[in-house]
Each structure stands twice: as C-alpha cells, then as structure tokens.
C-alpha cells in the first residue's frame, strides 16, 4: 500500500504539470509566510507562484482563477512591493497595520457577492468547459479584495483569505488537484496565523483602541 502511494506521488510529480504544481505550491507557501512577517520578499515569491499557478489553472479549465493570477495578481506583486517599501521607509518601527470599520467591511463583502454573481453568470453563459463558475467567481473576487486590503495593510485581509481557503479546498480536491487542495489547507492555517498576528500587531500599535477584535476593529 505504502509503495503504491509513493509510486503514485513520484509519477505525478515527475510529470510536467506535477512539477508546476509542486513549485507553485512551495513558492506560494513561502509568500504567505513572509506576508505574515511583513517581509517585502513576499512579493517576489508571490510573483513566481502566480506565474506557475496561472498556467496550471488554465490546464484545468479554471478560467477565472487563471485570469486572476495573470491579469491581477502578477501586476499587484509589483504594486505591493513598492507600496510596502514606501510604507517601511516612512515607518520608524514595525510596519503599521490598519483596521476597517464594521460598515466598511460589510460593504466590501456585499460588493464581493454582487461582483461574483455577475461574473459567475457571464462565465456560465458565454464560456464552455468552465468548472464551478459561480464558486470560481466568488473565490476570484474574494481574492481580489483580500489582495488589495493586504497591500494597504488592513488586518481584515486575513478574514477574506481564511474564507476563500475554506471554499477553495473542496473545489480543487473535486477537480483532482489534490496537491493544490492540500496547499490551501496549509494556506488556511497560515491565514489564521496571519490574522492573529496582524490583529495583535494592530493592538500593540493602538493600545488605546478598546474595541473588540473582529472586522469592525475601529468604531
């Protein structure tokens, strides 16, 4: 049994797509870990993972995810690098973490659902071979919002990452992308750790803020 499993893993990762998935997984995991630490190298490893996963998603018919990787994530790695570098140059201590109000966060969530509904309908209506168009669109727009919030250093970005990971894990598993599904389990753990770390950083930077931790960190 063990020999069969090991043989299957070896054969999979020896294939071209298997290698793409493996290295994309490694680079992406490093990217998330460095983001938790406010390390600007996160954007370099993020760019490597984006390129590999963009290609991989195209092969599996996940067109929204592929477009997200190449048309949004890739340029955002450059934007994120320069914004974090500029913020680091201005900050005298640890990178400043910001917080949204409850109303702001709720508005963003409503916007995500609305955009995903329209996007999913267009994919389902005008494309062929798309897998899980509405769920694919939802994770796409959640990722876009989370990425923008992360670039701007809002702690709520991690809430969206956690929610997106929870949705993505079964989708990729059903699609047969077992390693990617496993990667998102790791991402889920890292995103949870990231949220805890950034909320703690915010509390340390704002000791007079007595609001309860959560999406509405500021009143």
Model-derived features: positions:
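Short, strongly hydrophobic alpha-helical membrane anchors
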Residues: 1-19
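Helix-coil boundary and interhelical linker segments in multi-pass alpha-helical membrane proteins
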Residues: 2, 55-65, 122-129, 173-178
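Hydrophobic, membrane-inserted alpha-helices
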Residues: 24-31, 48-54, 141-146, 162-170
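Membrane-helix interface "capping/anchor" motifs
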Residues: 33-44, 148-160
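Loop-to-transmembrane alpha-helix initiation sites
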Residues: 65, 69, 176-187
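Membrane-proximal helix-loop-helix units in multi-pass membrane proteins
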Residues: 84-142
